[in-house]
């Protein structure tokens, strides 16, 4: 476990990354058939930087020394920012899946995801109000199960949600990154 407090300097970040990398080297390599890791980036309140951390984590995992297959999921209920952060035009979003959950498989998922030049694939959130169908915990479990079979890492920008769907994501996650700031609203 590593906790970084601001102000951060490059040496502090580098030391934490090297420690993480050395721990990774100690783990035996998993066979490719193993399920991918789900990393849930959850904010203690809005505006703390969950999207920034999720996007940068996904880009680093996809293009680091040991590139991995990475999916980035924007679970902000409406108007998620991941396509904006990546300058990406997403044609589809997870609302399309919730309407067609019976068709969900690797092929359908592959057609829904937006591909970014850095190597990550993005499942964005709806960018409009009409026709929006919120995912249920069961739907999310199915979506993430398919994505775990397709990718080494599934990074989820969960925003600051605390509903049943968010609880299901936390339960399925291999790792949960709770993003906070040193302010009273974040602690309450």
What do these predicted regions represent?
Residues 64-122:
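Phosphate-binding loop that captures ATP/GTP phosphates
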Residues 78-79, 127-130:
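A short, flexible beta-alpha/helix-coil linker loop
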């Amino acid at each position: 476990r590593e906790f970084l407090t601001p102000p951060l300097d490059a040496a502090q970040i580098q030391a934490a990354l090297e420690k993480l990398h050395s721990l990774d080297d100690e783990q035996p390599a998993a066979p490719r058939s193993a399920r991918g890791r789900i990393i849930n980036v959850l904010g203690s309140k809005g505006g703390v930087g969950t999207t920034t951390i999720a996007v940068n984590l996904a880009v680093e995992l996809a293009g680091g020394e040991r590139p991995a297959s990475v999916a980035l999921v924007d679970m902000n209920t409406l108007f998620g920012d991941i396509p904006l952060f990546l300058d990406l035009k997403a044609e589809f979003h997870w609302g399309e899946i919730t309407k067609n959950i019976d068709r969900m498989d690797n092929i359908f998922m592959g057609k829904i995801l937006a591909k970014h030049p850095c190597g990550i694939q993005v499942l964005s959130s709806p960018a409009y109000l009409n026709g929006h169908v919120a995912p249920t915990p069961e739907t999310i479990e199915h979506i993430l199960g398919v994505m775990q079979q397709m990718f080494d890492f599934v990074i989820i920008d969960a925003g600051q949600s605390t509903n049943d769907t968010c609880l299901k994501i936390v339960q399925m996650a291999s790792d949960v990154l709770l993003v906070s700031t040193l302010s009273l609203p974040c602690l309450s």
